[in-house]
Amino acid sequence: MFGSINNCHNVKDFRNLAKKRLPSPIFHYIDGAADDEITYKRNTDAYEECDLIPNVLSGVDKVDMSTTVMGQKLDIPLYCAPTALQRLFHHEGEIGVAKAAEKFGTMFGISSLGTASIEEISNLVKTPKLFQLYVHKDKGLNKALIELSLIHISEPTRPY
């Protein structure tokens, strides 16, 4: 078995290392999915249908992986999805992930159940951001969170 991230070469390797290193409840929180896990299954099935067949040593001098998501240009076709309680997994929590998203020129998703505030993250990084609202019974709290996200998260100009 591996004891180092340097020995991880695919998603399965990272998952096995996380399972070995993390306390069981934290691993299962990260490894699981919401509700009945239908979206998790659909995403997994979709990824299994993809074959990455590289065109080896052909046209690698000008590789451009950039894309546009919701009007925001990203340097890579991936983004850091909103995940609640990230300090459970790492001492920097959302702050560390937001910095990594900025470093790699991609979007960072802020969860309303995060361990860092919308203001803190928005003041720290200029990378494109989105906000995931967990709807609460308290409509006043929902309104306040939406207003904060409108103030602190850049919204691209819509073409319509």
How would you label these PLM feature ranges?
Residues 2-74:
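An N-cap/entry alpha-helix motif that binds or orients negatively charged groups
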Residues 76-78, 97-106:
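A short, Lys/Arg-enriched amphipathic alpha-helix followed by its capping loop at the start of a domain
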Residues 78-81, 106-110, 129-133:
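Hydrophobic faces of well-ordered beta-strands that scaffold small-molecule active sites
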